[in-house]
Amino acid sequence: MADIIIKNAYVLTMDPDAGDIKKGTVVIEDGKITEIGVKTKESADTVIDAKGSVVMPGLVNTHTHAAMTLFRGYADDLQLAEWLEKHIWPAEAQLTAEDVYRGSLLACLEMIRSGTTSFADMYFFMDETAKAVEASGLRASLSHGLIELWNEEKGENDLKEGKRFVRAWQGAAKGRIKTMYGPHAPNTCSDEFLAKVKEAARQDGAGLHIHVLETEAELLAMKERYGKCSVHMLDDIGFFGPDVLAAHCVWLSDGDIEVLREKGVNVSHNPISNMKLASGTAPVYKMLERGVNVSLGTDGCASNNNLDLFEEMKTAALLHKLSTCNPTALPARQVLQMATVNGAKALGTETGMLKTGMKADMIIVDMKKPHLTPCFDVPSHLVYSAGGSDVRTTIVDGKILMQDYRVMVLDEQKVIEEAQKAAEELVARVNS
């Protein structure tokens, strides 16, 4: 007997070999997809009738800072330097481990509700984020942020903590947690330190999560310091490879794109954050054309201000149609691929498609809504019309985290109240 059967659904497999099934069935057993088709002879403990809904792979958020939910709306519409120096950094200096747990748990709740089943996170007090992931049932790739600032002692301490975290949590939560090394950025870490981090990651078989060329200021600073941009500096020290997740990649030259392609670097595109902070427009259309694996991220709530990947998909599609003056750029199905298949590839997880033998990470989207009627093209509706609030059911590793809009794994009201309290107390400490 199977664990879960989802029937009567429009099955958006994202598997190019299988295509979509207009009235299909998905069978789940022991955390994996065991059957996909029109009908099944199997019976199950739980049968979900998904008539009028789409079942699709869960969305993958490849760059965020979960605990920054506590900074949602805290400081907006400011110049970057003022935003960081007068608001975000002073607030982060007051963060406690308990704050990070409460903020991360709130982020997990928000992601469950909006259809994200897996995410990549880089921040501080990462044991607390890992505990939140464990409690929520989500899948995550986590890294402790390493910010050396050309201070050898600080770098050694950060790297020591990064190693401890990687080794302590790798494979935790029944394999749902993967760990990575998280050097913050080339303009906050020296080339010598970045080379050490790369070697540590190689020894531990872990990936690397790093911000790259998010701003023009970084580009100019790197050229002044090294006589070259971030991409070429990282390439020269042997940092790049398929194990690297590079967030933002806004200020890229054509030559930079070629380096990323040659080395198999995975890019996380964060369009809303880049627009809100006026960082610039990443050359995503060019990257995709040249075969770079580009996925989607939200960045932290301080610069987004939510974790809704449906909103991120629509924004990405529209931004690059506008920036290229080409209405055919980033069509709906390609953007869906960025949020599922490409994201799973970037994080090295057996997810992103609905395919027999793959992990059962999926969502059910309710299409019986005024703003989703009529429906001529399902991928188009998912990208241009749907939102995270249309997700009715979320499943990770074969476990139902939310069913028919009811979160099953967390006390929703308690999570919200405790996060609100943590945020208010944090701001009070900052202002005292």
UniProtKB/Swiss-Prot annotation:
State the free-text cofactor note.
Answer: Binds 1 zinc ion per subunit.
GO terms of biological process kind: S-adenosylmethionine biosynthetic process
Can you state which reaction this protein catalyses? 5'-deoxyadenosine + H2O + H(+) = 5'-deoxyinosine + NH4(+); S-adenosyl-L-homocysteine + H2O + H(+) = S-inosyl-L-homocysteine + NH4(+); S-methyl-5'-thioadenosine + H2O + H(+) = S-methyl-5'-thioinosine + NH4(+); adenosine + H2O + H(+) = inosine + NH4(+)
**Molecular function (Gene Ontology), one example:** 5'-deoxyadenosine deaminase activity
Pathway field: Amino-acid biosynthesis; S-adenosyl-L-methionine biosynthesis
| Residues reported in the UniProt entry to bind substrate | E92, H184, E214, D299
InterPro entries, per the entry: Amidohydro-rel, Deaminase_MtaD/DadD, Metal-dep_hydrolase_composite, Metal_Hydrolase, MTA/SAH_deaminase
| Enzyme Commission (EC) number | 3.5.4.41, 3.5.4.31, 3.5.4.4, 3.5.4.28
Q: Which Pfam families match?
A: Amidohydro_1
Oligomer and partners: Homotetramer.
Q: What does this protein do?
A: Catalyzes the deamination of three SAM-derived enzymatic products, namely 5'-deoxyadenosine, S-adenosyl-L-homocysteine, and 5'-methylthioadenosine, to produce the inosine analogs. Can also deaminate adenosine. The preferred substrate for this enzyme is 5'-deoxyadenosine, but all these substrates are efficiently deaminated. Likely functions in a S-adenosyl-L-methionine (SAM) recycling pathway from S-adenosyl-L-homocysteine (SAH) produced from SAM-dependent methylation reactions.
Q: What else is known?
A: SAH is a product of SAM methyltransferases and is known to be a feedback inhibitor of these enzymes. As a result of this inhibition, organisms have evolved efficient enzymes to metabolize SAH via different pathways. The pathway found in methanogens differs from the canonical pathway, it uses the deamination of S-adenosyl-L-homocysteine to form S-inosyl-L-homocysteine for the regeneration of SAM from S-adenosyl-L-homocysteine. 5'-deoxyadenosine is a radical SAM enzyme reaction product which strongly inhibits radical SAM enzymes.
Give the family, as the similarity comment puts it: Belongs to the metallo-dependent hydrolases superfamily. MTA/SAH deaminase family.
Record's protein name? 5'-deoxyadenosine deaminase
| Originating species | Methanosarcina mazei (strain ATCC BAA-159 / DSM 3647 / Goe1 / Go1 / JCM 11833 / OCM 88)
Designated gene of the protein: dadD
